[in-house]
């Protein structure tokens, strides 16, 4: 009996060990991409992106390990990494096969300055002419160098009455436009983006965030003593975490330090798109707000809302926000609809320990991890490529081709709302209004359904105008005819009476 029990126990133990050994492999192969349906329920999705490669110090063959890298910038087929802890910038080149290789290490420049090295550079940008702009945070300056690393000029702390004299200038993130104007996010300066003219002069603060406050807290502060006020939280604008200049010259700006209640109340936006007046022109017509995960509960030891630490935008107007809280990437289209969401915290490929920056070359995504000191490269899957093809074809006016691409995407993911809406929009442009209405109805798209219905009704009226006129005429003439017959009948009846 004991032998039987021992055998059963051994078999069970072996089964458990086998299960444990196979579970991680299953988890690794399982899709970690998701979206939301109309009701807000999470819907698993085929992967939109897959990991193409992960580059660490070893894979890149660096002379020494990266140390707390903070910035990433793509220019053509070149990728620039701010190796912040090593006080340098690494220039990488992408080969034909997509592999990255080191071009040079940039740790000093030529010029008649006392300090010609960097101290904790946190961001970099390259102009069309090849000039390099560097947020040299530790040296309290923004540098402009030519393509041969000759010093051109520097941008210093703004001279403005709103900035205290003892403020240390800490440029953190920057962007440049085609005219050579510089936009900077500086730690400790919450007036908005610092805008410099091409000659280095401070121009203005741009796009300061709205101040959100609790009315009860406001009343408390209004009637509090000076000592009590000093202990209370001040109602001040929130600093931006990062900025990105898109191909049209608009600035995407993200805010990581957001509160759940402010996001849900709509008093704060996690990402904005600023025009040259500093106005937020980001379209938010999506089913859900543009702030990452719509559920903010505790999971895996992480709680609170998504905290966007960087953003990048493709030429097809899809912009991707990087969440440093849960290590996820959220892609949105130009209407604010969620295109994809994927990622997570961890050590596996496609997961992150401390995502710091995001960039793109074509539609490939590059994510810099400041803790693991690695660059993860993502390429579109078949599903993702169908979606991008459909968007591009629609923008070119190739509506039939766009419809077919959306159909292929739908075949791979029958729960993908955008595919149904995309098919409907393509049919709408092809003037197939009745079919378009059917697709919009399936996904409860009332706005587009209304557009299709109005056109369908208009055409139906035009095609049946003769019948409509006939019915209207009959509606009016038949009662008149019946009345006339009755009148004649009464006259006849009266005539018969008088004859009698």
Each PLM stretch: what is its role?
Residues 3-25, 475-481:
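Sec-dependent N-terminal signal peptides of Gram-positive bacterial secreted proteins and lipoproteins
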Residues 2-8, 383, 402:
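Generic alpha-helix initiation/capping and coil-helix boundary signal
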Residues 23-433, 443-444, 450-500:
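Eukaryotic scaffold repeat domains enriched in small/polar residues
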